[in-house]
Amino acid sequence: MSAVQEALPAVRSSRDATVRRFALTDAIFHATTRAAAILVLVLLGGVAISLFAGSWQALSTFGFSFLTSESWNPVTEKFGALAPIYGTVITSAIAILIAVPLGIGIAIFLTELCPRPLRRPIGMAVELLAGIPSIIYGIWGLFVLAPFLQTTVQPLIISMFHGIPGLNGLFAGPPYGIGLLTSAMILAIMILPFITSITKDVFDTVPSVLKESAYGIGCTTWEVTRRVVIPYTRIGIMGGVMLALGRALGETMAVTFVIGNAHRISTSLFAPATTISATIANEFTEAVGDLYTSSLVALGLILFVITFLILAIARYMLMRIDARTGA
């Protein structure tokens, strides 16, 4: 028997041991990643179940009227979620309307128009805005923005639209400074860095050959941005907007400072109002009685459902866009 034949069993044994070791490592890796994925679903389900269980007393007591009633009276234990829902939706919608054009515009400037020496400082300034705690925004809004709006902007707007049908009610009432519009402006400032950063990052993924080809046939910067950059990155932009909207819907401290915390619905954007998160933050520690606490938990469940529905609608919209464009 040759030396090679004598060494074959040892080689096979070493190879089999290596294969078994790799197989064990691979199995552990698969099990760990699978457990992590399942944990996410378990946590999500646990949050939903705990919110539903905690809100059951309020939901069973008030029924569907909990969603349609504006009343919120802890003394008589009559609770309705319509006013907080209204405030949450209106402030978030206005914030998105303000922040999306600004964020996309800043991203276009940074990627297409900004001189190279200024790109890094401006980009760092945008990222710094994202790192400021929300309570700082709230304090700034209460002591700086709200007084400025009260003494300067709101009286001017009220006088401009006074007597104009349809718009006079939208900007009616005394200039409190705080209210729906102030909260929406604070939210817009807070979510602006998210939209800008994500949009800038997805703009950077556009292949240079596409933009250079468009410039080569005589397209302007506006045409390149509109016809090449934005269509190529639409899904990433939508993702950034949805992330910002989720931040706006759930924001608590900054909104609590400047919204006025009034459980009422007004057509005026200058009127004090409240949101779901602000109501929970203001009243949870003062909730006396099981029904009061259950009503606050029910508000949390409603916010959970609203956020889930918005993300589901966004996903559906992206699927429709992909199907229509063949992406």
Swiss-Prot record:
A matching Pfam family: BPD_transp_1
Primary location: membrane
Top-level division of the source organism's lineage: Bacteria
Single annotated GO MF: phosphate transmembrane transporter activity
Ranges for domain ABC transmembrane type-1: 85-314
NCBIfam families registered for this protein in UniProt: phosphate_pstC (TIGR02138)
Protein name: Phosphate transport system permease protein PstC
Organism: Mesorhizobium japonicum (strain LMG 29417 / CECT 9101 / MAFF 303099) (Mesorhizobium loti (strain MAFF 303099))
Gene: pstC
